[in-house]
């Protein structure tokens, strides 16, 4: 079952990568990459369906195998996404891009495997949920503001990081709901960070630096969820030099991706 879980998770990563590449292709080709305009584009909608399929396969894989096997397979989406995006733009990813993506993936796998598992109940009161939404909202707003004065690659990274923060907050709130802390306003609040994250991500994709935006999202999302889990749910954090080295590796790979030429700019 473990091998089957790994294979399903790998296929899920492929679907997620395809969806991200399709959405980036459409967002980068739209003068105003807002949701109303993108929702009228069939290819962008197909990308959304592919992402949902990838998420569904990931959930199935988690039901069949251990987290330590399934989660690293999810990181493979970054390695799939770059060649797919390059093909859509009629280009070929450079060796430098693929190497940088591999470095990011290696760092992410290290971080995923080093996060301690928590066996305790997941409970968050109304004040905790309010804190979760406020902190993620302020952080993403600051990143949005910073993107206004950044270079193109920096803008893509900051917007995607803001999106990852909001997606991490969404994942944390969803975990609280799944574990039984049902509250009607929790359910009403859940779509807010998710929709804001989607909007910020499309803005990041529209900049054109797909590699750096997708890598930034892949890093910020799980790290935010881990941070909120530690701060608000009392979950353990990884400690020691190895997690720090893994984080540095992922960051270095993202910086290297930021220094590459956007796919759309190549001739």
Name each model-derived stretch:
Residues 1-267:
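Polytopic alpha-helical membrane proteins, predominantly small-molecule transporters/carriers
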